[in-house]
Amino acid sequence: DLNKFEAEMRGEFGIXSA
């Protein structure tokens, strides 16, 4: 699922918004 992918991108860009 994209959950892990999104979590990785959020960590990379420092985004906290879903």
From Swiss-Prot:
Organism this protein belongs to: Spinacia oleracea (Spinach)
Protein name as annotated: Thylakoid lumenal 18.3 kDa protein
Compartment(s) of residence: Plastid, Chloroplast thylakoid lumen
Broad class of where this protein is predominantly found: plastid
GO CC list: chloroplast thylakoid lumen
Keyword terms, alphabetized: Chloroplast, Plastid, Thylakoid
